[in-house]
Amino acid sequence: MTPRAIFDRARLAQLHGRELASFRAARPRSAALAERARAHMPGGVPMSWMVKWPGEFPVFVEHAEGAHFTCVDGIDHIDLCLGDTGAMMGHSPAPTVESVTAQLSRGITTMLPTEDAIAVSNGLFERFGLPYWQFTLTATDANRHAIRYARHLTGRSKIVVHDYCYHGSVDETFATLDGDGRTTNRRNSIGPPVDTSETTRVVEFNDVEGLEKALSEGDVAAILVEPALTNIGIVLPDEGYNEAVRELATKHGVMLINDETHTICAGPGGITRRDNLHPDFLVIGKSIGGGVPCGTFGFTQEVADRITRSVELEDIDVGGIGGTLAGNGLSMAAMKATLEQVMTQEAFDHMIPLADAWADGVQAGIDAVGAPWHVTRLGARAEYNFSPEPSRNGQEAHDADDFELQQYLHLYALNRGILLTPFHNMALMSPATTRADVDAHTAMFDECLRELFSQP
């Protein structure tokens, strides 16, 4: 059974119209700013994704702190999106703000190292177990650099990714499987430089046999994975799947890149440390700087030795790795404070039980109306999906999507002061999130479903 079979679509449209009217009425200042913004920004936003929020215009933020933000219309919001993980440790955590503020007066960027870089790289080694680290401004760039090194070291060109993966704006990852199981450009991918079938081989998540086949041709440089899919809903690995990926990578001489940018929600060392995984490279960004643009990639001793032997000093600045602002003093100050004082085990001991409570509340609301939906959990992150059973791969998760329904549920929440990520039904807990915040969502969600599934 699908959601379309158990409630009236006409009623959904009617309720959605009501919520749109309420949204407009409550936010005149955001509406006015959106109109002004359209003069010189397409869609009235500084970054195109911001048009995907469920209202007719984005909510403009006046102030964000902890797990709440206030919009320009004076409405307080519980933030369960948290900048889609960028603010997973809360908005403007005090240690990060203090460190960044001090660094601003000492110099923002010099293209020379600061002492903070030593502390950050040491801390990342202790956290993830990889001994060497380099820094970027985004996880996207960290992924790009890891892929380039993998190609350089293996002499191979292709990469393998999971169907419906997400690794930032890395060109090679905007690929999916067509109906015949062949790699093709992802729908609505904007301006791909080449057909992704030339650069990429796509396999389904949790498909060990498919991965073995993809690697068997001997032309794959790297497997780029999230240890659990997070951007098509949460898709958890089967028992032993990540270990099988490692074994197959080793067997076929392929570099394994674990992208923990979202899955860091599993704990201070992400799924990699929690499950004792052993990638050749590990990538992380977003949350490690407390909201300041940061990214990093770590690698093994073997990889470091091979890079040292094969990269020439004379051309190191034109080899496609690095960037003028990467490793700047401000980013390093932000990462040092965030990693040492904010992204701690104690923080996750607070966050993960709250995510469990959120998931329990959502599941209770689903069960109360008999909806064939389920909730999936991953550390401090949880998500509800419009299918009766958890998805085992990206295609199953994609097939369970319902954009109209999602937009309504998100708008209903937003009108009651609760923000979810706009891309799917994900909630993220921060160290500043409280049980009262979770309970407010539980009550709102229950009310929303009872109205949607009742007869008018």
Sequence positions of predicted segments:
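Conserved N-terminal phosphate-binding loop of PLP-dependent enzymes in the Aspartate aminotransferase
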Residues: 1-456
